Amino acid sequence: MLFRSIGNAVTSVKTNLMFQIDPYTGAELTELPMNYVFSPLPMFWAYISKVTGVHPAIIAHIFIPMIFIPMSYGVAYMIAKRIFGDARLEISLFMVLYAVLQQYGYVSVYTASTFLLFRIWQGKAMLANVFLPCLLLLGDTALKKDSKKIQCIPLLFASLATCCCSSMGVILGGIEMALLVVVYFCSSKKVSVLCRGIMVCIPYVILGCAYVLIKL
C-alpha cells in the first residue's frame, strides 16, 4: 500500500492516464480499482507534480508532511481552545500531551501516530489525523442551536474532503456526522439543527450509494 499510493501518482504522471495502468506490473487494468476511485488523493499528487514539474515522491515525502503535520497540530490546538477557552496553561498541557503521544505512539504500524509521522501523504493518514478531528471541531460550530446557516459551509467542504481522501472517509466520516447530528438535535430539540445536519450528510449518502451500486 505504501508503494501503491505513490506508484499510482508516478504511473499517472508518466502515462497521462488515471487508474488504467497497474503500477505494480505496468499492465493495463481490466477493471477500475474501486477503492482508489473513491480515494483519488494519488491523482491529486499527480496533478501537482504535472503542474509543478516536481516528482510525486518528492511532493509526498517532503512537501505534504510540511503542510499536513502542522495542520494536524493546528486542529488539535483549536479543539483544545474549544474545550478550555482562554486557559493558556490547560491548552499548553493539552498540546504537550498531544505531542508526546504522537512522538511515542509507534507501538504498531497501524496507530494514528505512525500514520501521521511516517506516511501522512496517504489518505487514511490524513483522515485519522486531520479530517476526522476537523469534522468534530466544525460540527460543534455548525450544529449548535444558535449557529448560523453559513457556518455549515466549512463543514460541508470538510465533509467533501473527508470523502475524497479515503474510501473509509465515506464510512467513518458519515458515522461521525450522523452521531453529531443526533447528539445536537436531541440536546437542542430544534428542527433547524436537524436540517443543517442532513445537508452536511448529503456527500456521505451520495458517495456511499454510488460505491454500493458500482460494487454490485
Language model region names:
Residues 173-202:
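Perimembrane helix-loop-helix junctions
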Residues 69, 128-136, 172, 176:
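Hydrophobic core segments of transmembrane alpha-helices in multi-pass, intramembrane catalytic enzymes
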Residues 1-103, 109-121, 126, 130:
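Active-site lumenal/periplasmic loops and adjacent helix-entry segments of GT-C-fold
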Residues 197-216:
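Membrane-lumen/periplasm interface segments of specific transmembrane helices
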Residues 132-151:
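Membrane-interface transmembrane helices that cradle and orient dolichyl/undecaprenyl
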Residues 88-94, 148-155, 193-200:
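Membrane-interfacial loop-to-transmembrane alpha-helix junctions, especially the N-terminal start
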Residues 151-167:
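Membrane-interface alpha helices of multi-pass inner-membrane proteins
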